[in-house]
């Protein structure tokens, strides 16, 4: 009874928050008159995912004037998950959106618990055209539910002008190891006072990037067994992170906004992140021509390491019991799985790295980008994506990472990595069994 009461109370709270004037949610609409007559989409990031959905709405309505109106709502990633899970658990289907974006780290948890609530798209989407690691992420129990969107391919983006002040050239930034990256970073900081990158103690994407570049994750390939204590790639990632801190190569930030403002304001010399960060880098047009992109550094002394990885990335999912599931499936598959002209538009306007194996079908594939000194950024990132190791993210990435963050902070004070990883292993095993 108590659980039921709590669930009802939570539902009321969420529904009230969704309509409250002070909500964090920002709604933009393509000529929406009635919510009930609109295809409703929830996504995050106005410069990337939500912008892509709005552009898709514009293109689709031009081709299909009689199609339903399309409403795009910007919410935070966590907010989308919590709201949708609560609505599904309570079967309040009339409040559901038709389409949601889910980050690749989260999707297995969602599909394990709510598989029957999503539209399987095997007969609508040609999944063979997507890179293997992205295709596998949208599968569950032999069916495919998502339309892969951005790759999340990791890359090293750097300010050539800042590095040149320290005596380094574009050639010096090719085929880096992590030790060489840190050597360059030390000299850059000594000569310019600019740290090499941002580090956020409350978020560990860099650890994920390094770990996956070695073909490992927080869980084994079965997606369930916690793989912490004997995970050499994780240990190496944490050692690299620690060394970056000890050598003062990282600027401490807290959260997304500080991360973005640091490189937009020229406070760091490089960014190691996913290709989706391109749209944020290019927001500051005064820096056009100053940026370059290259492969991530290679982890030394690990025979499985490659200079390629992934961070984040997402796909579109259609809710089966929403008001307009069928027409939403028509819209999403046409725009995001079939229309190569529209994908060209996204490459040009938001800098997406599509999840396609073969980008030569896109006219914009070899386009050069003056912002990056004439580099063919899409082609480069696609070449990186082709060798990203495939790992099983499982369904507990963020839960295990929360444990790791807490214990790693203690390790930085106590200096005992073995003890740290042992504690994380024990706690992660408990989480993995839930």
Where are the predicted features?
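Hinge/lid segment of periplasmic solute-binding proteins
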Residues: 101-155, 180-184, 209-214, 292-296, ...
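Extracytoplasmic/periplasmic substrate-recognition and gating elements
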Residues: 62, 66-71, 89, 166, ...
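Extracytoplasmic "Venus flytrap"/periplasmic binding protein-like
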Residues: 65-132, 165-167, 269-270
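Glycine-centered hinge/linker elements that transmit conformational signals in sensory
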Residues: 182-187, 223-253, 296
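Mature extracytoplasmic/periplasmic domains
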Residues: 33, 52, 116, 277-279, ...
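Short, low-complexity disordered leader/linker segments with a strong preference
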Residues: 1-40, 62, 426-434
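Extracytoplasmic/periplasmic solute-binding protein
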Residues: 145-149, 154, 179-226, 233, ...
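A structural signal for short loop-to-beta-strand junctions that line the ligand-binding cleft
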Residues: 86-89, 95-98, 122-163, 184, ...
């Amino acid at each position: 009874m108590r659980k039921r009461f709590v669930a009802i109370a939570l539902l009321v709270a969420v529904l009230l928050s969704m309509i409250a004037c002070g909500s964090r949610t920002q709604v933009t609409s393509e000529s929406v008159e009635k919510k009930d007559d609109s295809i409703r989409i929830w996504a995050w990031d106005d410069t990337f995912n939500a912008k892509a959905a709005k552009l898709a709405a514009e293109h689709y309505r031009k081709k299909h004037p009689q199609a339903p109106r399309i409403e795009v709502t910007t919410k935070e990633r966590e907010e989308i998950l919590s709201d949708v899970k609560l609505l599904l658990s309570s079967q309040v289907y009339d409040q559901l959106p038709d389409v949601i974006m889910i980050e690749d780290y989260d999707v297995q948890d969602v599909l394990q618990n709510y598989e029957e609530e999503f539209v399987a798209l095997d007969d609508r989407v040609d999944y063979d055209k997507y890179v293997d690691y992205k295709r596998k992420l949208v599968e569950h129990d032999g069916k495919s539910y998502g339309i892969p969107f951005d790759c999340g391919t990791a890359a090293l983006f750097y300010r050539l002008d800042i590095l040149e002040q320290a005596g380094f050239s574009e050639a010096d930034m090719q085929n880096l190891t992590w030790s060489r990256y840190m050597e360059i970073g030390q000299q850059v900081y000594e000569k310019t006072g600019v740290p090499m990158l941002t580090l956020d103690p409350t978020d560990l994407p860099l650890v994920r990037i390094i770990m996956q570049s070695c073909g490992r994750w927080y869980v084994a390939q079965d997606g369930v067994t916690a793989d912490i204590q004997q995970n050499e790639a994780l240990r190496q990632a944490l050692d690299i992170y620690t060394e970056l801190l000890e050598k003062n190569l990282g600027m401490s930030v807290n959260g997304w906004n500080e991360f973005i403002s640091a490189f937009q304001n020229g406070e760091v010399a490089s960014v190691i992140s996913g290709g989706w960060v391109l749209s944020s880098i290019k927001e500051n047009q005064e820096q056009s021509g100053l940026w370059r992109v290259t492969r991530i550094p290679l982890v030394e002394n690990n025979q499985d390491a490659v200079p390629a990885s992934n961070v984040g990335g997402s796909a579109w999912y259609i809710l089966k019991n929403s008001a307009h599931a069928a027409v939403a499936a028509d819209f999403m598959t046409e725009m995001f799985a079939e229309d190569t002209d529209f994908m060209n538009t996204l490459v040009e306007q938001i800098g997406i790295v599509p999840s396609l194996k073969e980008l030569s079908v896109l006219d914009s594939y070899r386009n050069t980008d003056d912002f990056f000194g004439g580099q063919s950024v899409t082609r480069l990132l696609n070449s990186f994506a082709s060798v990203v190791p495939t790992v099983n993210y499982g369904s507990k990435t963020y839960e295990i990472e929360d444990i790791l963050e807490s214990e790693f902070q203690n390790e930085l004070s106590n200096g005992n990595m073995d003890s740290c990883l042992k504690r994380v292993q024990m706690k992660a095993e408990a989480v993995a069994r839930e």
